[in-house]
Amino acid sequence: MIKKLILDPKNVSIIKNGIRNYSKSKSFIQPITTLSEEETLLKETVANFANEKVRPLVKVMDETSELNKGLLKDLFDMNLMGIDISDSYGGANMNFMGSIIAIEELAKVDPAISVIVDVQNTLVNNCINRYGSIQQREKYLSMLATNTVGSFCLSESGSGSDAFALATRAVRQSDGTFVLNGTKQWITNAKEAGVFIVMANVDPSQGYKGITAFIVESNNPGLRIGKKEDKLGIRASSTCEVILDNCVVKPTDILGELGRGYKIAIEGLNEGRIGIAAQMLGLAQGVFDSTIPYLMERKQFGKPIATFQGMQFTYADLAVDIEAGRLLTYNAARIKEAGLPFVFQASMAKLHCSRVAEKAASACISMLGGVGFTKEFPAEKFFRDSKVGQIYEGTSNIQLQTIAKEIVKNFNK
């Protein structure tokens, strides 16, 4: 059948013209990793920023577990905290792919700074941009794009992978306000945040349909920051308890609608998983790029160790894994941008890239030998930073479960 179609005289000219036009335009089918001029400029700009502004601060921020305040201001000045927020609100007015590119480039130097930008753009900004009222968008997107860190409060001590087994309650009062009580745990950006998206259960009898998202500002007297975690990695990014103690919010602080918190959180996390994939991809590329030059320079038995077959097999295998991760991540981002279902691709990208990040960091330490085990080389920090990729925004087992569900769903169509 296909042969007949190709040999049909009517189709031969169409095929020939198509090939001729393709050879002229060179743009018949663009590779997944092709970037627009604007995206390429962003990539170069963020790479330069990361090397010039972030790299000199990485060691101190890691040792002290503190984000440099001047660097945070620089992130806002560079518009990296509002990448796909409209310029009418002070944002960079780019696309979702722009956020992914920035996250990847920052992670090549410091995954901790990368995740700060990731949570801001793929979770907080996106949720308010999509579900916020006109008044909420005008107020909060302007703040988030220019000077205010955002935080996404879902997890609790008793709700990790079962993220919606929430104990935090929101009780409606006679005057229409809601009183929030509960403790959120492992909340990224909590120490620096001025705006929090808080998930609370208004009606536990309704299950996940009782969950509602509220916007709470840091100056609310009922909200305070609790214990800051002393973490293995991504130490410049704060991870804290957020304690809600008779925290009063107005009906106008509801994000979306009453009972829509589950949908808002799920959609936000699905997009956030592409962001984490980009972070882990950048980490893998960063540790790889910092290791190869040493292998070229270091000599044993009169030869650069990069020429030894055992070494070659190791770093060639890593290069394949990293490039596959880039294809998965960029493809998921492009599908999301096109408005198509992307959950399957997002989970695959996060699963693969988080695995590759740990694999790459571990392998690079082994290839570096003794120096890789010291803090003189960045590989040990990349190794510590890599582990969280398999934990937050859905563990690797949750990603496998999601992928399996999507396979079954598509098979049964």
From Swiss-Prot:
GO CC terms: mitochondrion
GO biological process: fatty acid metabolic process; isoleucine catabolic process
Keyword Flavoprotein included in the entry's annotation: yes
Enzyme class, broadest EC rank: oxidoreductase
Entries under InterPro entries matching the protein: Acyl-CoA_DH_CS, Acyl-CoA_Oxase/DH_mid-dom, Acyl-CoA_Oxase/DH_mid-dom_sf, AcylCo_DH-like_C, AcylCo_DH/oxidase_C, AcylCoA_DH/ox_N, AcylCoA_DH/ox_N_sf, AcylCoA_DH/oxidase_NM_dom_sf
Cofactor(s) the record lists: FAD
Keywords: FAD, Fatty acid metabolism, Flavoprotein, Lipid metabolism, Oxidoreductase
Active-site residues annotated for this sequence: E393
Superkingdom to which the source organism belongs: Eukaryota
Annotated SUPFAM superfamilies: Acyl-CoA dehydrogenase C-terminal domain-like, Acyl-CoA dehydrogenase NM domain-like
Annotated metabolic or biological route of this protein: Lipid metabolism; mitochondrial fatty acid beta-oxidation; Amino-acid degradation; L-isoleucine degradation
Assembly notes: Homotetramer.
Membership in a protein family: Belongs to the acyl-CoA dehydrogenase family.
Name by which UniProt lists this protein: Probable short/branched chain specific acyl-CoA dehydrogenase
Organism: Dictyostelium discoideum
Lineage of producing organism: Eukaryota, Amoebozoa, Evosea, Eumycetozoa, Dictyostelia
The gene coding this protein: acadsb
